[in-house]
C-alpha cells in the first residue's frame, strides 16, 4: 500500500448559548476543543479550538443582516499535513423587494493554515443572489459569485467569476 493512511478518530466538546439581545437582534456563540488522532502515526494528532458565532439583525420586516464566524479543522491530502485550521467569516444583507422576490448581497473571508507545512491561504468572495418564489416549495435562484484565493503555494492563487441559475424545491 502506498501513501498515508488518513483514517482518523476525533472528538469535539463545545458549549454555547443563544440570546435575544432585543426584539430585532439575536446572537449565538459556542466554543470548545476538537481532538483528532490518525491511524498513520507519521501524522501528528491535532488539537484545536472550535469557535462559532452568529448575529442576526432584523433591520425591518423586509431586511435582515446576518454575520457568521466559524473556526475548525478540515481534512487535507497535502503531504506532511495532518489537517488544516480554518477561520471563516460571512456577512449577508437580505432584502425582500416583493412578497415573492428577495435579493441578497454578501461577502466572505476564509483563512486556512495547514498543520505541519508552510502553506497559508487567504480567500475573499462577494455574492449577489436573487430568489423568486413561485409558491411555498418552488423557487428560482440566480447567483453571481466573485472569489479569489491567495496561497503560498506557487501557481495556486486564483480569481473566479461564477454564475449559477437553478430551481430550488423545498418539500
What are these regions (language model features)?
Residues 11, 33-37, 71-75, 109-113, ...:
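Transmembrane beta-strands of outer-membrane beta-barrel pores
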Residues 23-29, 61-67, 99-105, 132-142:
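Repeated loop/turn-to-beta-strand initiation elements of outer-membrane beta-barrel proteins
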Residues 11-15, 31-33, 49-53, 87-91, ...:
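Hydrophobic, lipid-facing positions within transmembrane beta-strands of outer-membrane proteins
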Residues 19, 57, 95, 132, ...:
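Residue-level signature of outer-membrane beta-barrel architecture
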Residues 130-133, 137-139, 159-171:
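Outer-membrane beta-barrel "beta-signal"
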Residues 1-4, 37-41, 50-52, 75-79, ...:
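Extracellular loop and loop/strand-boundary signature of outer-membrane beta-barrel proteins
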Residues 1-58:
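Acidic, glycine-rich loop-and-beta core segments that form the ion-binding/anion-interacting portion
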Amino acid at each position: 500500500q502506498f501513501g498515508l493512511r488518513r483514517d482518523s478518530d476525533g472528538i469535539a466538546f463545545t458549549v454555547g448559548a443563544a440570546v435575544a439581545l432585543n426584539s430585532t437582534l439575536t446572537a449565538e456563540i459556542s466554543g470548545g476543543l476538537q481532538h483528532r488522532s490518525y491511524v498513520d502515526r507519521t501524522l501528528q494528532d491535532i488539537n484545536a479550538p472550535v469557535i462559532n458565532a452568529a448575529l442576526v439583525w432584523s433591520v425591518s420586516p423586509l431586511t435582515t443582516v446576518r454575520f457568521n464566524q466559524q473556526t475548525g479543522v478540515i481534512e487535507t491530502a497535502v503531504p506532511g499535513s495532518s489537517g488544516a485550521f480554518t477561520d471563516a467569516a460571512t456577512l449577508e444583507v437580505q432584502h425582500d423587494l416583493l412578497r415573492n422576490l428577495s435579493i441578497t448581497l454578501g461577502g466572505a473571508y476564509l483563512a486556512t493554515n495547514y498543520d505541519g507545512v508552510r502553506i497559508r491561504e487567504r480567500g475573499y468572495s462577494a455574492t449577489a443572489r436573487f430568489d423568486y418564489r413561485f409558491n411555498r416549495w418552488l423557487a428560482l435562484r440566480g447567483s453571481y459569485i466573485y472569489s479569489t484565493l491567495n496561497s503560498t503555494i506557487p501557481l495556486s492563487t486564483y480569481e473566479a467569476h461564477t454564475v449559477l441559475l437553478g430551481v430550488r424545491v423545498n418539500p
